[in-house]
A protein has these predicted regions:
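Redox cofactor-anchoring modules in respiratory/redox and cofactor-processing assemblies
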Residues: 1-146
């Protein structure tokens, strides 16, 4: 593709999505952790400006959801809830409350999951919220004043 660079995702499915502003970040454990990513499996995916970052987060969450062993409730149920919210957002049916719940679920999984998969599954969501928040906001359906 001839598109312009938008983001790089490091560390495999539970790594973070890093915007162009951080391209000069050294690829080491500490530096990646400072910007919300991980070294993980050492994978690197490069995305151009045609990439929908909310859908990217949904794609990686679906993978983590499918790979969850189901032993702990935070990961087993949390990844399903997060995937459902991301799917609604991608379809343009999400709400601001969905985004707030997504952030709460990210914190819950990181703090309470028993293994590395559950603890790192929120990384793509957290980094896309941090660096591409406007894409989430653009997907929120028009809400009536309540």
């Amino acid at each position: 593709g001839g598109g312009r660079f938008k983001a790089a995702q490091t560390g495999g499915p539970s790594g973070g999505c890093i915007p162009e502003a951080y391209l000069d970040t050294p690829v080491d454990y500490e530096s990646l952790a400072q910007i919300g990513s991980i070294m993980g499996s050492g994978g690197l995916i490069v995305m151009d400006d045609a990439s929908d970052m909310v859908d990217v987060a949904r794609f990686f969450m679906e993978f983590c959801m499918d790979e969850s062993c189901g032993k702990c409730i935070p990961c087993r149920a949390g990844t399903v809830q997060m995937n459902d919210i991301l799917t609604r957002l991608v379809a343009g049916e999400g709400t601001r409350a969905d985004i707030a719940m997504l952030e709460e679920l990210c914190a819950l999984l990181k703090e309470t999951s028993l293994c590395g998969l559950g603890q790192s599954a929120p990384n793509p969501v957290l980094t896309t919220l941090r660096y591409f928040r406007e894409e989430y906001d653009a997907k929120v359906k028009a809400e009536e004043d309540e």
